[in-house]
Amino acid sequence: MVNKVKRRVSCFPKATYYKPREIPLCCLEIANISIEELEAIRLCDLLQIEQNEAADRMGISRKTFWSDLQRARQKVADALVNGKAIEISGGEYINTGECRVNFLCKECDHMWEPKFDQNRPTNCPSCGSSLIFRLGGDGRGKRFVENDYCCPKEKGSSRNTSEGSKKKLQ
């Protein structure tokens, strides 16, 4: 297997999950977009940077950038047209340090910001647990799974009586 060149990524999304409204996540297919694919979309489509410059910023060839961009656009289009959830995660990238990323340990609630030249941590520096999650911005974007199930009708979930549901029923 050929080693994939790690792309330089300078910004991370504030939210890492998007899904169609009113459909439980457990009932949806998920389109996974890697961090570097999102960076390609951000540079080319959002910031409208020419592909040559965008490829240089990511430290890859123009052909590789084009492949990443096309793959990402195809995944987004598939999710939007076919009603899939979009998860932004994973990939082989290097954080250039321009955006801050925090991690949270689910075991001990320790929150920390790794050094910019560090790869994604695999364990909590406080307790050593591998149950760590990246926080986007103010904590939004974490996958919402309560008690290992996601459908509101299962196991008498208390989410049926959430404030949003109450407003909808009235």
From Swiss-Prot:
Stored Gene3D superfamilies: Winged helix-like DNA-binding domain superfamily/Winged helix DNA-binding domain (1.10.10.10)
Source superkingdom: Archaea
InterPro entries attached to this UniProt entry: RNA_pol_sigma_r3/r4-like (IPR013324), UPF0251 (IPR002852), WH-like_DNA-bd_sf (IPR036388)
Alphabetical list of Pfam families matching this protein: DUF134
Coiled coil regions, renumbered to chain: none
Entry similarity comment: Belongs to the UPF0251 family.
PANTHER family found in the cross-reference section: PTHR37478, UPF0251 PROTEIN TK0562 (PTHR37478:SF2)
Protein name listed in UniProt: UPF0251 protein MA_1017
